[in-house]
Amino acid sequence: MPILSRKDLERISRRVLFRYLTLSDRKMDRIDPVDFAEKICGLHFAFADMSVTGSILGLTSYSDVDLTISVPRGNGSVQEFHLNGNIAYVDQNLANAGSVGRLNFTLVHEAAHQILGMLYPEEYNPSAQPFICRLADERCSYPITDWVEWQTNVLTAYLLLPRELIDRYMDELGLGRQIKLLNKVFAPKEYALFSEMAKRLGVSKTALSIRLDN
């Protein structure tokens, strides 16, 4: 598989977002994950109970794959997920819990897998890895042990939080070009504005804070 840097992934995001804007006829106040996934890669979503522990948030496959995954449940039943490259399953608890930020990140994350698979079909070989699970972690841990997930997480952040939208809301909320101290106790005013910014963008505060550092 290709080893892509943050700069590489940002350049990819710029091309993809430009394409998305040409397909949309409205002002962008935030990236709509469902609309984005459908327009860019024809991906649709279905909600399901992904795991008993909540450790798996999403499941999808690259294009040209047709398979069914059977997952044993605690009550002795078996749940089947049919994958064909056009559907991604998302953990139902994300919607039930009202966690909009984590839900949106997961939706774009699944689309980002498809985008990388389309750009690098030989490297992201479906026969070698026919399906992909998204684990419950928005952070990019170091040292990197899973380049597929690291690259997908970074691309997701660039797609969901383009620099233009960040700069726009930083200006509108009076945060300037940089938040020097992000702390709920020692900088409550800035933290409240930062929280409002995350709400407007439809992301978690964790995802936004990571994006602001990169």
Where are these regions (language model features)?
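Active-site hotspot residues in diverse enzymes, especially metal/ion-binding acidic/histidine motifs
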Residues: 1-214
